[in-house]
Amino acid sequence: MLEICLKLVGCKSKKGLSSSSSCYLEEALQRPVASDFEPQGLSEAARWNSKENLLAGPSENDPNLFVALYDFVASGDNTLSITKGEKLRVLGYNHNGEWCEAQTKNGQGWVPSNYITPVNSLEKHSWYHGPVSRNAAEYLLSSGINGSFLVRESESSPGQRSISLRYEGRVYHYRINTASDGKLYVSSESRFNTLAELVHHHSTVADGLITTLHYPAPKRNKPTIYGVSPNYDKWEMERTDITMKHKLGGGQYGEVYEGVWKKYSLTVAVKTLKEDTMEVEEFLKEAAVMKEIKHPNLVQLLGVCTREPPFYIITEFMTYGNLLDYLRECNRQEVSAVVLLYMATQISSAMEYLEKKNFIHRDLAARNCLVGENHLVKVADFGLSRLMTGDTYTAHAGAKFPIKWTAPESLAYNKFSIKSDVWAFGVLLWEIATYGMSPYPGIDLSQVYELLEKDYRMERPEGCPEKVYELMRACWQWNPSDRPSFAEIHQAFETMFQESSISDEVEKELGKRGTRGGAGSMLQAPELPTKTRTCRRAAEQKDAPDTPELLHTKGLGESDALDSEPAVSPLLPRKERGPPDGSLNEDERLLPRDRKTNLFSALIKKKKKMAPTPPKRSSSFREMDGQPDRRGASEDDSRELCNGPPALTSDAAEPTKSPKASNGAGVPNGAFREPGNSGFRSPHMWKKSSTLTGSRLAAAEEESGMSSSKRFLRSCSASCMPHGARDTEWRSVTLPRDLPSAGKQFDSSTFGGHKSEKPALPRKRTSESRSEQVAKSTAMPPPRLVKKNEEAAEEGFKDTESSPGSSPPSLTPKLLRRQVTASPSSGLSHKEEATKGSASGMGTPATAEPAPPSNKVGLSKASSEEMRVRRHKHSSESPGRDKGRLAKLKPAPPPPPACTGKAGKPAQSPSQEAGEAGGPTKTKCTSLAMDAVNTDPTKAGPPGEGLRKPVPPSVPKPQSTAKPPGTPTSPVSTPSTAPAPSPLAGDQQPSSAAFIPLISTRVSLRKTRQPPERIASGTITKGVVLDSTEALCLAISRNSEQMASHSAVLEAGKNLYTFCVSYVDSIQQMRNKFAFREAINKLESNLRELQICPATASSGPAATQDFSKLLSSVKEISDIVRR
C-alpha cells in the first residue's frame, strides 16, 4: 500500500517524501483518487507533485516535441483528437499559425496551436498560468482554500512573474526576482536556477511566504479557437449546416438565435439580418470587422452566410447571455467584488486590443458584453464598430447611438474615437458596480447632454472603492484628450489594489456606510433627476429598500440605448443598502410616487450639508457665476468657477468659516459623505467636479431657513430645492415633461424655454462664455448681447448685477419684490427674516427696505428720478391684474412695481405671464429692469440680484419650500444678493458708468425685439431660418469695416438668432438638435463679440475677424437646417 501511495505522489522511495508530500500521502490513504464527488481543483491538487518534471529527460530537448494542455475533439477538416498531457510532434503550421499539423501515437492531423505547448516550457506545469492580471489571479483563487496558488506573468510587464497565494480568505502576491547571476528567488536567502525548483522549495517550506504552496489553481477556461478550420479564410458556410433553435434576442439589424453547427456538433449564436432592412452593407461590415479581431475577450466570428438572404453571422455561443441581464439576475454572494473587478479587467483587456488595432466599438455597454463559463466575459455586438483610418470617425446623418453611453463630443458632432469608447467604458464600469442599474436613473435622454455639460456626473455606487470611482471619473473627462487610454485603464486595474484587496476596500466602504447609518444619515444621496416627479422617485429609491419596484425611475421605463436595449429593464433590488431614513415612517416610504412630493426635502434636511449637488437645469453657465456666497470673489475666481471646478463659496474657501470644505462635507457630483470622513476621491479629482456648490457647504447657516421647508409643494415645477436662495444650483433641477412645449412655455429667458433651446456645448467654455450665459434670453437676444457687454466690465460685481436682457418683462417686478425673501448672502439675520416671511405665507406685508438712492455708479439723479416715474406709472397700470397676488406676496422695496402674474399660478412660466402683461406693460417692465441694473450696488444690491437670477426653475423652488399650497410662487429667488457689496462698489463704479450709453441702446433694442419675444416655435419654418441666414450673409457682404457696419450686421444677426431659438424645437432628431444648439451658441457668442467691438476695438481687422467667425457659424446653422 505504501508503494502505491509513493507512486501516487511521484516519489521513488520513502526518503523522497517531504513534509508536503506527507500531507498528500495521508490524504491519499484516506480517500480514493480523483473521485467523482470531489472538486476538480482538489482532485488535481491531490495528484500534484511539486517535483514533477524537475529533471528533464533527453527527449524533452526536442524543439518539435509538444504536450497537450487541453482535450480537443476532432470535427472534420483533417483535425486530430488529443487528450490533456499527451505528447505529440509538430510537423507544421497553417497560414496564420493558429493551427498546427501534429502527429501522435493515434495518428496525424490538425490541432489548435494554443492547445499545445513545448514539452520543456513552463506552460506544461499545472501551476503556471502565463500572462494573467492581478485581478484575474484573485478571481482564479477566489474559490480556493488555504495554500491554493498559481504562478503568473504580469500582463503589463512581460517577463515579470509573481506567485499569487491564498490564505485565510485573502490572496497574497509575491514578486519573483532575478538575481544578477540569473537565479530566481522570492526570499533572498533561497535562490534557484529554475522556476520549477523555486516552486518545489516553497511547497515544502514557507520561507517568507504566508504559507506553503499546496494546491495549484486549475486552468479553468480553454483558449478560444480562432476559426473552426485550418483552411485559409474559410468564412462562408453552408446554410444547411446550421440548425436554428430558439430566439435569444434582438440586435440592431435583426435577431439572434441559438443554433447548432451540425458538422461540429457545436452550439453557436446566429445573428440574422431582417429581410426587409436596407442595412445589408452595415451588416456585412460587422462581419468584416469580426474577421480581423482575435482576442480571448472578444466574441469570435465562426462564419457567415452571405450568398443569399437571410444573411447570417455565426459566432461562438456564450452560455450565460449578456452581461447586463447576468448582473441583474446573478447571486451577488457568488458574483462578489472580486468577480466584478475580474469582469471589468477582461473588458479593458479586450478594448486595449481594439485600441492597438485601431478599431472603435461605438456601442460599448453591459448589454453588448457576453458571459461564459467561469465568469469569462467577451465584448460583442460590433454592429457599430469601425476600423479607424484617422483620429476620429464621423457617423452619417441619422445614425442612432445610445445617448447615455455616448461621449459628449459624439453627441454634439457625431465624431467618434477610441476616447469616446473610453467614456462608454466608464459608464459600463458604473453598470458593473451597480449590478446592472440603468445609468443616470430618473434622467431623460434629452437631458443627459445638458447635465454632462454642467460637469454633472453619476454618483459613486454603494460600496464602490474610491480608486474604482476615480477611474470612472477619469473616463468621464469632458475633454477627450484628458481621458486615459485603454492601455492605461488595463494597467490601472492591474495595480489598483497593490496594498490591499478589492474585497477589503468594499468592506471598508460598506463599513463606513454602516457607521453613517448608525448616525442616522446612512443613506447615499440619490441621483438628482431633472424632473419633479423623478426627483421624488430618486429619493424613494434610497428610502424604500424593501420596495424594489421604486428603485429605477424614468431610466427603467425608457429605452436607454434607443433600439439596442429593451424598453423596460428588470427590477433591481439593490444588494447593499442601509436601513431607511428613520425620519420617514413606513407609510411615507411606501407612498405612490406621485404622492411623494416632499420626500427629498426631508432627506436634505436630515443630511444637512451632505446632500448631493443637483444638476442645474438652467443654462449651463447661467447661475454658476452668480453664486451668492462669492461676494468677495475675484474675477479669476469667478472664471475658475465657471469653467468646471467646484463652485465653492467664499465661506468654503476659508477653513475658519467652513472647515467641512476640507474634511469631507462637500459632495462631489452626487456622491455624499459624512463630515470628517475621508473623501471619495483624491484631491486632484476635486477640480474635475463642478457640481459641488457653496450652497451645500454653507447649508448650516441656513438651517433655520430650512426649518420651515419640510415639504415641497407639488405645484412647484422645481420641487427639489431646499428653502433659501443660497441653494442656487438646486433651483434648476427639473424640466417640464413635454420638451417641445417647454420652449413655448418658458420662451423668454426662462429656464425651461431657454434650456430646451440652449446650444449644446461639446467643449467647456471659457469663463466669459459662462458669464454670458448667466442671463441669456431666448426671446430677447439683443438685450442679452448687451448683457455680455455689461458683464465684461462688471466681472468683479457679478453677484449684484441685474440682467434685464434675460428677465421677462412681466417677471422683472416679481424679481425685485422677492429680493427680501431670498438673499441669504446678506447675513443670517436677513435670511431668518426671509424665512419667517415665507413661512407665514406672506400674508402680511413685511417692512420694505428703503428705496435705493440715486445711482452712485454712474446714473445721474435725473435718470434715477426717471426710473421712479416709470415704476410708478407701470405699477399704476397693472394693479387690477395683480391684485390677487399682491395680497399674498411679501412686499418688495418701494421702487419695484407690482407687475406680476396672476395669483394662484406658482408654476406659470414667465413667458406666459409676459404674454398676459401686454405690450406697453412689457416695455415699462423692461425699462425698469434696465434702470435697476444701475442702482447703487451698496444699497440696491438685493433688487439688482433679483434681476440677476431670472431663471424660472430656480424661481419657484425656494419660495415654495415653505409656502402653503395656495401661495403663489414668485419666480425670484435672488440667490446672489450682495449683502456686503461695499468692497466691490469701488470696482463697479467705473464699469457701470462705462455702460451708460449701452443702457439706452438696450432699451431701444428691447422695444424693437418685442414681437420676436412672442414668436411660437411652430411658426418658424426651415425656409425662414435659411432666408435669415442669407440676409445676414448679405448684410456682411454689403457692409464695409466701418463702425456703421456693425449695426446692420448686428440687427440681421439678432433676427437670425431669434428665429433659430424658436426653430430649435422643430428639429426632431436629437443629434441634429444638439448640433443646432451648439451652432446657436456660437452665433450668439460671435454677435456678442461684434456688439462689444465698437466700444473695444477701433481697428478694421478686428471687425473683419469677427465677421469671419460669424460667417462660419452662419454656415454651420445653414448646413444643419438643410440636413
From Swiss-Prot:
Changing T315I: Loss of inhibition by imatinib. Loss of inhibition by GNF-2. A motif (Nuclear localization signal 3) lies at residues 761-768. Residues 863-961 are annotated as: DNA-binding. Disruption phenotype: Mutants are born with the expected Mendelian frequency, but fail to thrive and most die within three weeks after birth. Most mutants are runted, and have atrophied thymuses with severe thymocyte deficiency. Mutants that survive to weaning age are most often runted, and about half of them show lymphopenia. They display a major reduction in the number of pre-B and immature B-cell classes in bone marrow with a wide variation between individuals, but essentially normal mature B-cell levels. Mutants are highly susceptible to infections. The modification Phosphotyrosine is found at Y70, Y115, Y128, Y139, Y172, Y185, Y215, Y226, Y253, Y257, Y393, Y413. A motif (Nuclear export signal) lies at residues 1083-1093. Residues 504-990 are annotated as: Disordered. ATP binds at residues 248-256, 271, 316-322. Keywords: Acetylation, Apoptosis, ATP-binding, Autophagy, Cell adhesion, Chromosomal rearrangement, Cytoplasm, Cytoskeleton, DNA damage, DNA repair, DNA-binding, Endocytosis, Kinase, Lipoprotein, Magnesium, Manganese, Metal-binding, Mitochondrion, Myristate, Nucleotide-binding, Nucleus, Phosphoprotein, Proto-oncogene, SH2 domain, SH3 domain, Transferase, Tyrosine-protein kinase, Ubl conjugation. Belongs to the protein kinase superfamily. Tyr protein kinase family. ABL subfamily. This is Tyrosine-protein kinase ABL1. It comes from Mus musculus (Mouse).
